[in-house]
């Protein structure tokens, strides 16, 4: 069977170490050659590519990327595809198409679905379905505790970092410090990243009615507000809340 060759030329190639004009040769869906330097037309592109890669024969497809930047695909470490159980919001197909359209080749999906992704079995099923769509690679996180209940970390004890590089309780915190420590130890022994939502849920709940009251006042009376600085002793940072509902924040 003939190989499918794509030659992308006249692009600006950008990664962590370069920002130069050049061309890229793709064979059967995989990059097999990168050449730096200005290449103005398809004839020049073919001469350069075939002189170094003699396997380039036949009629390759040429793409003139003039005015475009060519970069490696991006990685999004926190996405919500809402699958399974919340597909009225998003699903694998729409999420993966959006990722591919935005240049994201790898995404890490959160476990707050219905049911919660608390087992390797369910996570593998989701990743298998995603891979069949051939749009972007999905790493499905497993919840730190079973069903977000904050008690049982048995499901993460034997995960492999190759399959599950990240675990997360997503938009909540494991309140019990002993349970969180056990979960971190389980992840640490396998070099798995623990993505934490560092927020005391009791303090967050207490603040909610006051936040809602302020937003309602701003919305009803068209009152603008500036930045709200949230400062702790060790994290002198600010959070910029922008356009919550119809309030101008």
Per-segment meaning from a language model:
Residues 127-133, 156-161:
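Acidic (Asp/Glu)-rich catalytic clusters
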């Amino acid at each position: 069977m003939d190989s499918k060759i794509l030659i992308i030329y006249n692009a600006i190639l950008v990664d962590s170490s370069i920002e130069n004009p050049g061309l890229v040769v793709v064979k059967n869906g995989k990059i097999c050659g990168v050449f730096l330097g200005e290449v103005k037309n398809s004839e020049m592109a073919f001469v350069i590519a075939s002189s170094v890669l003699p396997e380039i024969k036949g009629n390759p497809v040429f793409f003139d990327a003039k005015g475009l930047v060519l970069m490696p695909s991006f990685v999004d470490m926190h996405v919500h595809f809402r699958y399974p159980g919340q597909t009225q919001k998003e699903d694998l197909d729409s999420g993966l198409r959006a990722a591919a359209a935005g240049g994201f080749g790898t995404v890490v999906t959160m476990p707050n679905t219905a049911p919660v992704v608390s087992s390797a079995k369910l996570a593998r099923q989701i990743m298998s379905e995603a891979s069949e769509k051939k749009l972007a690679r999905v790493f499905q996180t497993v919840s730190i505790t079973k069903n977000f209940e904050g008690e049982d970390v048995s499901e993460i004890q034997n995960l492999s970092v190759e399959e599950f590089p990240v675990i997360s309780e997503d938009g909540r915190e494991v309140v019990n410090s002993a349970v969180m420590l056990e979960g971190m130890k389980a992840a640490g022994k396998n070099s798995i990243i623990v993505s934490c939502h560092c927020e005391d849920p009791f303090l967050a709940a207490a603040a909610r009615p006051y936040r809602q009251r302020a937003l309602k006042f701003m919305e009803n009376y068209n009152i603008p507000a500036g930045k709200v600085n949230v400062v702790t002793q060790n994290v002198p940072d600010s959070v910029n809340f922008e356009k919550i509902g119809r309030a101008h924040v």
